[in-house]
A protein has these predicted regions:
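A structural micro-motif
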Residues: 17, 37, 69-71
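Primarily recognizes the serine-hydrolase "nucleophile elbow" in alpha/beta-hydrolase
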Residues: 1-35
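Alpha/beta-hydrolase-fold serine-hydrolase catalytic core, especially in secreted/extracellular enzymes
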Residues: 60, 64-71, 77-150
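Short beta-strand/loop motif that positions the catalytic acidic residue
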Residues: 34-35, 40-43, 47
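Short alpha-helix in the alpha/beta-hydrolase fold that links the catalytic acid
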Residues: 51-61
Length: 150
């Protein structure tokens, strides 16, 4: 979930091209690693499972430390904990995530794609059950080929 995404991205920003966390927070006091990669936080203001304050604490730390240049964050008014989950059924989500690469100079954030609550009504419309199966790739081979071996 959101906590796991923030924790992993904060720990390994040099190994992750971009991250998107929904309704989370960070388990670490030092969240500065989240400022080293394009990162998008979406949280509903009516979330009773994980209060929006958890995400706001992370954003406030990044802003205070001047590490927010690669950060996008949205507080969706009235959205509960489950509402943002539909984001992962939108093509725009993957267009944004995959528009970033570890090899991008200075790792800029793509601000040309927006995702709002009004997009969620189309979320399941992007699902095509008759689409061909995705090609499976050998992750370690791709990483080595791109020169991102660790």
């Amino acid at each position: 979930g959101g906590y796991g995404t923030m924790d992993v991205c904060a720990t390994y920003p040099d190994r992750i091209a971009a991250g998107m966390a929904l309704c989370g927070g960070c388990s670490y006091k030092d969240v500065s690693g989240l400022g080293d990669l394009p990162f998008w936080i979406i949280h509903g203001t009516a979330d009773r499972a994980v209060p929006v304050k958890q995400s706001k604490v992370v954003v406030d730390k990044l802003v205070k430390d001047g590490k927010d240049t690669r950060l996008i964050y949205d507080w969706w008014k009235g959205a509960n904990h489950g509402t943002p989950a539909r984001v992962f059924y939108l093509k725009k989500t993957y267009q944004w995530l995959f528009s970033h690469s570890l090899s991008d100079k200075d790792r800029p954030v793509n601000r040309n794609i927006s995702i709002t609550m009004s997009d969620l009504g189309r979320a399941y419309g992007d699902v095509n059950r008759n689409a061909p199966q995705p090609e499976l790739i050998d992750g370690p081979s791709v990483i080595k080929q791109e020169g991102n071996e660790y």
